[in-house]
């Protein structure tokens, strides 16, 4: 009996990762035992994701403004190398997806087109949407969680307050600290929230619908695994010149797991901010790089766009040469960086990539519908890769800067 109490005490008071693991097991068990009961606890997951999404825009705006307003003159923020890592990582992901698609060609059973979807007409429209998000009304940006706009206004307000009185800067810092405390409280609810998410997902899908797309999922998840465990560690090693895997596994464990179940990079911003704080990274850096990464660091999206497009190409018997494949990698990488500016994310950028091969919009939308069918796995894995990489590259750039100093 005392042993059981000890185990329960360790689970309740131990690491958040262990508590989340217990929540996952409990969710799977409940869904297997009683799907009806599992559906009844779905609201726990919705509440958790809703709380994260609610606090994230406020956190980003206040933290960015506070960090820049209180920044010491001449301090290094390391943003240039982080942005370069984001872009290199996204392009490498698209290239890896091309190689995986050629190595394991996949045919699709095309289904009805995704009803009501409204994909962008071209890369210009994607970039145009992003540009207008930059000058969005700040109140509207807060309400709609427009992180591009929040970053722009946060940076602008921070710069404007650089020469404000000390009391004003202290007030801004105190507000930032208060919001961070709220975030910590919400993150403590992760095990309960993930329990609800897992139970509801398994009860509602059962994963039977995914069996017909086993090979497609294999290529998608295989490409994401190569990026997470081979390419990203290689990039980080070149940056920090030491074994990257302890950092890689920490980011996947403490950021990727939560992102996998929330399926939202925006909702995972507070989790990533808290992880950066535990890693003792520069607040001036991660307060900007993490929300920026949630917007433009889209390795998972690049893989999804590339793999599904090449699956459609293979299904239709279209020949693809090396030059076209490389061009697809570039288009997928650029499109992925704009995925946050498109309702529906990476899946609705597939018609844009399909147009490179002359595939009609009707067929492209059937490919999108396939994407929605496997979304319970694809979207979760994509978000986990995207979000954990934000912290990984931020930490790598900060460590590299410290090593040079």
UniProtKB/Swiss-Prot annotation:
GO terms for cellular component: plasma membrane. The chain crosses the membrane at residues 13-33, 43-63, 82-102, 141-161, 185-205, 217-237, 298-318, 339-359. The keyword Coiled coil does not apply. Keywords: Amino-acid transport, Cell inner membrane, Cell membrane, Membrane, Symport, Transmembrane, Transmembrane helix, Transport. It is found in: Cell inner membrane. Pfam families: SDF. Disulfide bonds: none annotated. GO terms for biological process: serine transport; threonine transport. It is a multi-pass membrane protein. One of its GO terms (molecular function) is neutral L-amino acid:sodium symporter activity. The keyword Translocase does not apply. InterPro entries: Na-dicarboxylate_symporter, Na:dicarbo_symporter_sf, Ser_Thr_transp_SstT. SUPFAM superfamilies: Proton glutamate symport protein. It catalyses: L-serine(in) + Na(+)(in) = L-serine(out) + Na(+)(out); L-threonine(in) + Na(+)(in) = L-threonine(out) + Na(+)(out). Belongs to the dicarboxylate/amino acid:cation symporter (DAACS) (TC 2.A.23) family. Involved in the import of serine and threonine into the cell, with the concomitant import of sodium (symport system). HAMAP family: Ser_Thr_transp_SstT. This is Serine/threonine transporter SstT. It comes from Shewanella amazonensis (strain ATCC BAA-1098 / SB2B).
